[in-house]
A protein has these predicted regions:
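N-terminal pre-domain/capping segments
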Residues: 1-94
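Active-site acidic/histidine proton-transfer and metal-coordination neighborhood
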Residues: 59, 76-127
């Protein structure tokens, strides 16, 4: 088995003074980094055109992409309407990741909400 490591930030670094996510992969490559996790922690708001452009820029500069799904995802929420919204957030994150050509989507699957791990898992599996 071959093990390799890539290094880069999750989100835009504080010392990146540009506003453009599309130009960020070039900035990372100039610093010797080769990975970037695009942050959708507060919601998925990037459009297809921008997502594809970020992906193209990342590939051009040898940057491996991943995407972080919204932080408020909770597959173990007992409320069916909330679980329906959660499913939508996960699918939206996956769609953007596909547009970007990201290797993976990072998602925190939720909180126990005063339930046992088994109860929370059963709810999540039903989602």
């Amino acid at each position: 088995m071959s093990i390799s490591a890539r290094f880069g930030p999750a989100g835009q670094a504080d010392n990146y003074h540009g506003k453009s996510s599309v130009k960020y992969p070039a900035w990372l490559a100039e610093r010797g980094l080769d990975a970037f996790e695009y942050q959708c922690g507060k919601g998925v708001s990037v459009g297809e055109e921008t997502a594809r452009a970020v992906g193209e820029a990342a590939r051009a500069h040898g940057i491996q992409l991943s995407l972080h799904a919204p932080y408020f995802i909770n597959l173990a929420n007992p409320d069916p309407e909330s679980r329906k919204k959660t499913t939508g957030y996960v699918l939206a994150a996956c769609q953007v990741a596909e547009w970007m050509g990201a290797e993976r989507v990072t998602a925190h699957t939720g909180a126990l909400m005063k339930r046992s791990r088994r109860e929370a898992l059963d709810i999540a599996l039903d989602t």
